Amino acid sequence: MARKVEKENGSGPIKSNHDLVRGVWQLFRLHTIEGLSTASIGWLALFFYATQQQLAFDLVRNAFIGIFATYQMTHCVFCLWNDICDRDFDGKVARTRDRPLPSGMVTLTEAMWVFVLGVFASMGVTYWLLGADVTLTMVPIWVLSFIYPLCKRIIWAPQVVLGLTMALCVLPPWVAVRKNSGSAGLLPASLFGAIFCWLVYLDLIYASQDRPDDQKAGVKSLAIFLGDYLKAGLTVLGVLQVVCFVLAASEASAGFLLWVFGIAVWSASVPWSIMSLDTRDRKSGGRIFLVNAILGIYMAAVSGLNVSLAMW
């Protein structure tokens, strides 16, 4: 509940900004689809493996549930960590100054306690649902998620660290099912490449809306570094992600449904996103980011439908 404080002139109680429950909810990004979009990367990889290996329904179902719980919790906890690290920057950027930490909705001490408890909870849930091997595979993801916010102060391409973090999310699903599978060939590598290029591309689009404020605040970003060549960089990343997805679909022996409603739709989205991005409009990047986040969920759904039809 929001605490009440006294006005300095003693004229009566007013509401403070402090609201722990609402603040943690927002720090966890539970008011957005970002967590679901993160889980969809794991689901997408799982469904590609299931298509290639013709996995049993029970195995896919159990991995699906475990991936959702693990990736959702990991996303929540490290979004909170990102906001802890960025609290001073966020207060200087128009779009983020109302976030829970700079606005006083949650104190730094409270946020740190929730973060520590959340890390242990994420590890415990991963071990319980997916086992020791997958938990070990998640360790690099947790480490990179911890490092990523700090990179904004050190290197000009923190998006590369984020891309590596999210691309590694294609590996735990494979570890979860590999005991019941044969060789995956180039499928894990091609999925890794596709997700890496997509996430760097996606975060560049997102970061484009904050470039003026980030420059003033001293935040390092590939979007700032590229300057007028931003769309050229997006084009290269867009082509590479499509090439990697085509290779992944070929490796998985994808059916007509996945090729037409998955790969083709994804390929068409790339030029649309780049041409629609208006760097003069501060809200353009956010809109296109949201469309692409939904696209990731859509791609996972199409891949899942493809697997379901093959099973039945």
From Swiss-Prot:
Its cofactor is Mg(2+). The chain crosses the membrane at residues 30-50, 64-84, 111-131, 132-152, 154-174, 185-205, 229-249, 255-275, 288-308. Its EC number is 2.5.1.-. Keywords: Glycoprotein, Membrane, Transferase, Transmembrane, Transmembrane helix. GO terms for biological process: terpenoid biosynthetic process. Pathway: Secondary metabolite biosynthesis; terpenoid biosynthesis. Its main location: membrane. GO terms for cellular component: plasma membrane. It is found in: Membrane. GO terms for molecular function: transferase activity, transferring alkyl or aryl (other than methyl) groups. It is a multi-pass membrane protein. Glycans are attached at residue 9. The keyword GTP-binding does not apply. Disruption phenotype: Abolishes the production of arthripenoids. The keyword Lyase does not apply. Belongs to the UbiA prenyltransferase family. Polyprenyl transferase; part of the gene cluster that mediates the biosynthesis of the meroterpenoids arthripenoids. The pathway begins with the HR-PKS atnH that catalyzes two chain-extension steps to form a reduced triketide, which then primes the SAT domain in the NR-PKS atnG to initiate three more cycles of extension to give a linear hexaketide corresponding to the polyketide part of arthripenoids. This is Polyprenyl transferase atnF. It comes from Arthrinium sp. The gene is atnF.
